[in-house]
Amino acid sequence: ERWKELLLQAGVDKAEVMPSKGNPMVYAERMVDPKAKTVLVYGHYDVMPAEPFELWKTEPFEPVIKDGHIWARGADDDKGQSFMQAKAFEYLNKHNLLKHNMKFIFEGEEEIGSGSLGPFIEEHKDLLKCDVILVSDTGIISPDVPSITTGLRGLSYWQIEVTGPDHDLHSGTFGGAVANPINVLCKLIADVTGPDGKIRIPGFYDDVEEASDEERKLVASIPFNEEEYKKSIGVKALFGEEGYSTIERTGYRPSFDVCGIWGGYTGDGAKTVIPSKAYAKISSRLVPHQDHNKISQLVVDYFNRVAPDTVTVKVEKHHGGYGYVCPIDFPAYKAAERGFETVFGKRPLPVRIGGSIPIISTFEKLLGAKSVLMGFGLESNAIHSPNENMPVDLWLKGIETIINFHLEYDKEA
């Protein structure tokens, strides 16, 4: 309801909260001319959980402006960036500068895979019909080095359950005679990645395309300080697939990571048990042309095949999505380039990023429209982490850049 109010205040013709099979959608539109081009703005109002709360310097759901930054969960991902879009539209509408139609669709399930949005798009194709989709849910290299995201990785996600004995056992009475589910789980997942950083699941790389020489030259031209990178995340050394740079590893190559692992006794003090069960949550970032359904099944089959007979392994498939590559030779991308150049004084670099927005490929499939990913986040904005923030000056430059995108798009259209 709050997003509906904000969009109405900004000047849309109509805005409504629409039901879906999950969380509701917020739809709004401003129709300037039925014959004009239409830009659909996508964003999401859901956020990642704020835990652990004790690591926040401010209340995560009480926005604070301090030291030139907005501090709050969602300040960047994606409430802050979606609000940029609304304010840019408000300016254009107020000053009679809008020459094309605008539609907005904000969802509430992006962080869990956008499970309801695909069916919603299928049901409301005519309502959402557009010529291009504009998204601010990504980032730039730095305030001094603007960039436009031209590629996203896909995603597969699983939960693994390893069961040994049918109840917890005394580690003295049974230790050394019974397989420990936690030990087994740790070995199973550790064996997936080799010392060379390669994922050792058969068939995993079958559909992975190597970056072209031209793309690798472009990546090599992107300003990147490895020492600063390590310092910013607090590690002494980096690890990844041999033969690829850090930027290539995160933008052009797939990954396999344990997101959480638990089992046994984790309370204060000691409790000497062999646990009955152990669990892990695992994500794999995929590159374009990898099918997340195929990869999900490959992983299920792999763990079932290599699991020892001393335990029972259950692999549950969670949400997934396809990667996306944005062409850099179509009118909306050129408009975005000029929008950045006008505000930042530099032509933005085209970059692929490691994150995923699964619904982007669905938009193209169902609506036949390509997306332009004009994000303004920074690595230091701590999305998905405590103390998420957005620099106020960058937020304002984001609004100005989006305004200029629309003005330039009218020239192209």
Can you describe what each PLM-predicted range is?
Residues 8, 94-97, 125-126, 165-167, ...:
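Generic secondary-structure signature for well-ordered alpha-helical cores
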Residues 119, 175-196:
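A short core secondary-structure module
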Residues 34-35, 48, 142-143, 200-277, ...:
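An extended, acidic, His-containing surface patch that forms the Zn2+-binding/catalytic region
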Residues 36-103, 397:
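Active-site metal-coordination/substrate-binding segment of hydrolases
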Residues 69-70, 76-151, 413:
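Acidic/histidine-rich catalytic neighborhood of metal-dependent amide-processing enzymes
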Residues 147-163, 374-377:
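Flexible glycine/proline-rich, aromatic-decorated loop/lid segments
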Residues 1-53, 277, 281, 293-295:
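N-terminal helical capping/dimerization or prosegment-like subdomains
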